[in-house]
């Protein structure tokens, strides 16, 4: 991700004063220069759009070739009942622009399948929501080829997931030095500390701060769906406490890849989840029958409160990496709307 950073105007500095105080002038300028593509303006896509538009992103292109339906009205706040039957981007463009007239917005209703490599080359980051899994893998293959970071998010009623592929990302964090100083070296299979520098507090020389540079490596979606495991990454006690949502989400994604368009039965879902439990190294008992039933019933349903949580999490991480702040998420999140757990797994 190599952006040409533009300086902020005095008006922009005044407009974004509060968030500049939070994450700094450089981070805000980075966001002002970023070009982001958002695919599908559903419930999650609407939440992400709202957050990054208000944050002061420079350029946002929304690609959505869907019409507004009555089913959209309960979960998508940019549209109303008067918009049913219209192109979604035609119905929402003025409302989105009103959030922040300063940003450059582009709307595109062309079918995703018609977009070629040249189209994607213009962006610094891609966010894809509510995708068929084969489409997501195809886009991920392309974004990797072009070295473009990618977020993929989807929901099924009370349950949701986020996949992140930043390919390779160097993050910098600063923290107060503890009794045991941070050292260079691997901290997980996907992350390594590559540099640690220190500075003294200007007001208290007894305090030392560490600036930690971390190399984050990511894996493509098709590889995650083929080889994801938690073996040797967690203790036996931790493996027994893994949420049902993880094997069920992976099962649903894998089933969508292999059996596109076909309804999934309880028996099939249970068998697939058991296979994933074995692959992950977790006991099959973590998958509960009532969760399987809920997963099947809620497949493909958008629920506004879940979209708000997932959209907010994705938008925050997008802002972090565009602003080159803090360590990014790495690399697979699931959300359980029943327990409100949202664990992060590193595959």
Curated annotation (Swiss-Prot):
Example GO BP: DNA damage response
Covalent cross-link Glycyl lysine isopeptide (Lys-Gly) (interchain with G-Cter in SUMO) as placed by the record, residue numbers: 35
Residues with PTM Phosphoserine: 9
CDD domains in the cross-refs: Aos1_SUMO
Alphabetical UniProt keywords: DNA damage, Isopeptide bond, Phosphoprotein, Ubl conjugation
UniProt GO molecular function: ubiquitin-like modifier activating enzyme activity
GO CC terms in record: cytoplasm; cytosol; nucleus; SUMO activating enzyme complex
Pfam family, any one: ThiF
Record function comment: Could be involved in a ubiquitin-related process important for DNA damage tolerance.
PANTHER family: SUMO-ACTIVATING ENZYME SUBUNIT 1 (PTHR10953:SF162), UBIQUITIN-ACTIVATING ENZYME E1 (PTHR10953)
Note: Present with 7430 molecules/cell in log phase SD medium.
Name used for this protein in its record: DNA damage tolerance protein RHC31
């Amino acid at each position: 991700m190599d952006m040409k950073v533009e300086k902020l105007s005095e008006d922009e500095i005044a407009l974004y004063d509060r968030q500049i105080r939070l994450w700094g002038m450089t981070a805000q300028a980075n966001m002002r220069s970023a070009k982001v593509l958002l695919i599908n303006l559903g419930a999650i896509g609407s939440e992400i759009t709202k957050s990054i538009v208000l944050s002061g992103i420079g350029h946002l292109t929304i690609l959505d070739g869907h019409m507004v339906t009555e089913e959209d009205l309960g979960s998508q706040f940019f549209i109303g009942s008067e918009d049913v039957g219209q192109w979604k981007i035609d119905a929402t463009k003025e409302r989105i622009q009103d959030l922040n007239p300063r940003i450059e917005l582009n709307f595109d209703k062309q079918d995703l399948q018609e977009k070629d490599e040249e189209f994607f080359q213009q962006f610094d980051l891609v966010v894809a929501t509510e995708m068929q899994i084969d489409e997501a893998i195809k886009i991920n293959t392309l974004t990797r080829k072009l070295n473009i970071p990618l977020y993929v998010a989807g929901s099924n009623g009370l349950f949701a997931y986020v996949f992140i592929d930043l390919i390779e990302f160097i993050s910098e964090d600063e923290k107060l030095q503890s009794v045991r100083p941070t050292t260079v070296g691997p901290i997980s299979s996907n992350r390594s500390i590559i540099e640690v520098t220190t500075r003294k507090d200007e007001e208290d020389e007894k305090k030392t701060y560490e600036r930690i540079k971390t190399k984050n490596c990511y894996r493509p979606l098709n590889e995650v769906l083929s080889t994801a495991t938690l073996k040797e990454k967690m203790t036996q006690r931790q493996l027994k406490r893994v949420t049902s949502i993880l094997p069920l989400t992976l099962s649903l994604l894998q089933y969508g890849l292999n059996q596109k368009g076909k309804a999934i039965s309880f028996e099939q879902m249970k068998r697939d989840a058991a296979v994933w439990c074995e692959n992950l190294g977790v006991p099959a008992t973590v998958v509960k029958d009532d969760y399987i039933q809920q997963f099947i019933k809620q497949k493909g349903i958008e629920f506004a409160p879940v979209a708000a949580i997932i959209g907010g999490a994705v938008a925050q991480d997008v802002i972090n990496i565009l602003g080159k702040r803090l360590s990014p998420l790495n690399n697979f999140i699931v959300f359980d709307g029943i327990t409100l757990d949202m664990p992060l797994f590193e595959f």
